[in-house]
Curated annotation (Swiss-Prot):
Organism: Buchnera aphidicola subsp. Diuraphis noxia
Pfam family for this entry, one: Aconitase_C
Enzyme class, broadest EC rank: lyase
Role noted for this protein: Catalyzes the isomerization between 2-isopropylmalate and 3-isopropylmalate, via the formation of 2-isopropylmaleate.
Lineage, top ranks: Bacteria, Pseudomonadati, Pseudomonadota, Gammaproteobacteria, Enterobacterales
Highest rank taxon of the organism: Bacteria
UniProt key word Lyase: yes
Name of protein: 3-isopropylmalate dehydratase small subunit
Amino acid sequence: MLKFIEHTGVVAPLDISNVDTDAIIPKQFLKGINKKGFGKFLFHDWRYLDSNQLKINNKFILNKKIYENASILLTKKNFGCGSSREHAVWSLLDYGFKVIVASSFSDIFYNNSFNNKLLLITLDEKKIDSIFDIVKKNLGINISINLLTNKVIINQKTFFFKLDEFRRVCFLNDIDHIDLTMNSLKKINVYENNIPFFLLNRKEFKSH
């Protein structure tokens, strides 16, 4: 993934609260561990009218042609609730979503998303309702997300959001926990070489 500074894309409105991970991707599709290929199972039971994916549910928002290239999902509170499954995040990313905007997310889904570089933007419910109003009156409209300024811009209106600074820096610089640890490797080695003997494990202590 490249550094995330700003993204502009079509926003798809999913006007549903408490979307759980089983709705995002049903349990029968969790067998693989490769992060690719899960997009076709995203919202499976809502997108299709049969288990074989032969009958499309034309009423579902993502099946409307105007949203076929949507990269931003707008939804309501408590998105990603239910059981912890990283596949839910993988399916959203593989489908093509880069950003999800909602009034709240489940804690586990929130952490899984950031660990996989899916950007989650939290706005209060009044702001979310305002954006829904704009989107419903302007089908297929774009939204711009700017991480340098912490702004959501749509239809010449600006909404400010807050994001944990650590996560923000990770997105802006395309780094993660491992990268940060590796950047401190010299300091870690110095510490380990100077650790007091009484903190060593039993095997290491005997060698001294």
